[in-house]
Amino acid sequence: MLIVLAKAQVGEGAMEPAMAAIKAMVAASNAEEGCIAYAFTQDLLQPGVIHIVEKWKDEAALASHFATPHMAAFGAAIGGLDFKVIEAVKYHADEGSPVM
């Protein structure tokens, strides 16, 4: 299993149009075969910061995700916005277990 943790900075005035693109991206990505979880969330303490959490079955599922039409549509939608990924890191993990 792969876990991707990413962070993006959205400029002032770009959050509303970015959120429309993000909602479509989350819905389409969660429907992909091999996607276990896919979520964006706004940081509560840092204005304009969005955290992205993804869980994929394997490398093939993640690679397939980057080739989807909705990934291309998302790139086009945010292309004109002040939206930049600050970091994105992929982790290899086992199935995990409850923390509590």
Task: Identify the residue ranges that each predicted region occupies.
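N-terminal first-folded block
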Residues: 2-39
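Glycine-rich beta-strand-turn "strand-cap" elements at beta-sheet edges
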Residues: 41-46, 76-100
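Short flexible/disordered coil segments
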Residues: 3, 7, 69, 94-100
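Localized chelating/binding microdomains
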Residues: 23, 52, 100
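Generic "edge-of-domain/loop-turn" microfeature
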Residues: 13-15, 45, 61, 95-96
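An amphipathic, aromatic/His-enriched active-site/gating alpha helix that lines ligand/cofactor pockets
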Residues: 24-36, 55-89
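Short, well-ordered beta-strand segments in beta-rich or mixed alpha/beta enzyme
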Residues: 2-9, 39-66
